[in-house]
Amino acid sequence: MLFESLGASIVTASVDTADEMKLVAEGKCFPKREKAMRFTVCHGVTHEISKTVGAFWYDHAEGKDKNYIAGESKDYMQPAEFVIDCILKKVILCSYSDGGLGRIDSGDLVGWLSGIQNRRDEFPHVWSW
């Protein structure tokens, strides 16, 4: 996998249950990839975890007039993405969102990681836009 060759690991997390996230990991629900994800998929994110990482929390009881997810009736953490340098033990890049925009693009991340490792010749970056 490309990220592994850059010394990076991908970990995802959701408020969903283990059974729901198993379907996501297997590519059997949104987004309908129809192929398994090759990275760690976690479940059970709580409001406390959201506060710990500084992410926005959608409280359904407070925001029921805003349909971020049509028909959805549960609380959830908004997208929060981090690149953590495990040697320095520091977050070196992060992105917080309150919807579908403003996320870290995987192609851009490959370019960024290869740049800080002085390996751009090995991993030529093509801007997605």
Task: Report each predicted region and the residues it spans.
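Chalcogenol-based redox active-site neighborhoods
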Residues: 1-129
